[in-house]
Amino acid sequence: MSKIVKIIGREIIDSRGNPTVEAEVHLEGGFVGMAAAPSGASTGSREALELRDGDKSRFLGKGVTKAVAAVNGPIAQALIGKDAKDQAGIDKIMIDLDGTENKSKFGANAILAVSLANAKAAAAAKGMPLYEHIAELNGTPGKYSMPVPMMNIINGGEHADNNVDIQEFMIQPVGAKTVKEAIRMGSEVFHHLAKVLKAKGMNTAVGDEGGYAPNLGSNAEALAVIAEAVKAAGYELGKDITLAMDCAASEFYKDGKYVLAGEGNKAFTSEEFTHFLEELTKQYPIVSIEDGLDESDWDGFAYQTKVLGDKIQLVGDDLFVTNTKILKEGIEKGIANSILIKFNQIGSLTETLAAIKMAKDAGYTAVISHRSGETEDATIADLAVGTAAGQIKTGSMSRSDRVAKYNQLIRIEEALGEKAPYNGRKEIKGQA
């Protein structure tokens, strides 16, 4: 009943109006799985390759017809007749057939769409929800938790057209008892933030991930307006709600210095920027910082981990790119203490699960994440619950491409009840 009989690839549109790959995997018995690949804006240099056509006359060169052709051609031919329940086997066939280190022949966008669609089809054939199937693939059947959301309510950097250097300013409703309550708390703060910004005469247009993208006097001012909104919503900052940032520091790393336009084009060394961040953590309850330095600045990261690593969560995104080879090296060198997990950085479900396992085995946390270019596909919600990862980053409280994931978490929590606890602050490295 779980034998693959047909695979279909197609070009669809993501949340930025760019094409992406969607795949359908059809099994005997009429079971179907469908999934779409996301796409990033600030990307790590060692990510698996997202295959684009490069034909400037079509979608400004961003078409994905080559990746779709790979799905409908060689990938489909290789997988028809195979058992969808063998996720590792399915992914290995595609990876071996591609034959490149970074999936550049078929594109990680092609391989990932099929990989996720296959998992959904197999779950359907087994008569179980996707999160339950993922827990079995992960070797942790029946072990679930609801993730603490990191809600990106002010967008800067590559995610917005404003003068804020730091890419994401996030809130974490750690004081909630359930994910549904956490989402309500986040929504209330989001709406109060709009009122705060409007009262200051600031723009309330939103960025790629649904957060506001105002022009602010400094990066610290973003934290100040969020603190004001948290208070206005009736919550206590540091107790009910904590703060997190994604610096995406590679985006403002120039000639060995960190150049912040929002701080008057001031240039910082690795050590100076680490202490700039440290000062912010003293002023505000920031409990997680992602990509606090450039992805290649490993000496700087070692210093940053030494200074901040026993106090807060230091998340590697561009640093580790969901790649077990790079993560292993980081663990050995004591770099950071958490990894951001993005399916499309590595390009298959099996490799994603391997990265989560390696992180957890080393005492690192794993934060499941969306990309800035998303679709209505909500697979990351099931991944977060099915691996009991504990944290999820999926944008703000607006834009259907972000809210789709929150709504899926609400549905899953309703189905699982007490089997999937919401552990709040305990999930964040250094906060237990």
Curated annotation (Swiss-Prot):
Keywords: Acetylation, Cytoplasm, Cytoskeleton, Glycolysis, Hydroxylation, Lyase, Magnesium, Metal-binding, Secreted. The modification N6-(2-hydroxyisobutyryl)lysine is found at K342. Inhibited by tropolone antibiotics which are a possible drug target. Mg(2+) 1 binds at D246, E290, D317. It is found in: Cytoplasm; Cytoplasm, Cytoskeleton; Secreted; Cell surface. The record marks K120, E376, Q408 as: Interaction with RNase E. The keyword Magnesium applies. Phosphorylated on serine residue(s). Seven-fold more phosphate is incorporated in glucose grown cells as compared to acetate grown cells; less labeling is seen in stationary phase. Another paper suggests this phosphorylation is actually due to poor resolution of substrate-bound enolase. (2R)-2-phosphoglycerate binds at A41, H159, Q167, E168, E209, K342, R371, S372, K393. Its EC number is 4.2.1.11. One of its GO terms (cellular component) is cell surface. Catalyzes the reversible conversion of 2-phosphoglycerate (2-PG) into phosphoenolpyruvate (PEP). It is essential for the degradation of carbohydrates via glycolysis. This is Enolase. It comes from Escherichia coli (strain K12). The gene is eno.
